[in-house]
Amino acid sequence: MKVLVLESIPQEYKEKLESVAGTDITYTNKNEVTQEQLQQSEVIIGNPTMEQLDTCDALQWLQLSSAGANTYAAHPKQFTLTNASGAYGVAISEYMLTCTLNALKHFPEYLHLQSEKVWENLGHVATISDCTV
């Protein structure tokens, strides 16, 4: 089975993929992938462009590296489509917590003032303690 990986993945994941018998794996990215690689791949891991997907004659399975799959689901080619839904839950949660704390503590404003070498108190800062966030 010809597998095309269009994402940078950790070595441990490469080793797991390569342990599957009968796989011929190519690692590249969607900016450097060749027409021949796209045409011959039965499995693609990553998010090819729609134009690239149009040329994937042998494609049986597309594993997206993103959660959003609407554009790919609407593609007329028939293939199994899976996404990375749930893979980013912790990262998104941490990002939202960071955004909330940045807003409550005036971090962007203080960072700007600090870069200007201005030491000004911006007043009351809120806390997330006892809050519904």
Regions inferred by a protein language model and the residue ranges of each:
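Short secondary-structure boundary/capping segments
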Residues: L17, Q35, T71-A73, H124-A126
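A structural micro-motif
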Residues: M1, T23, L59-Q60, F79, ...
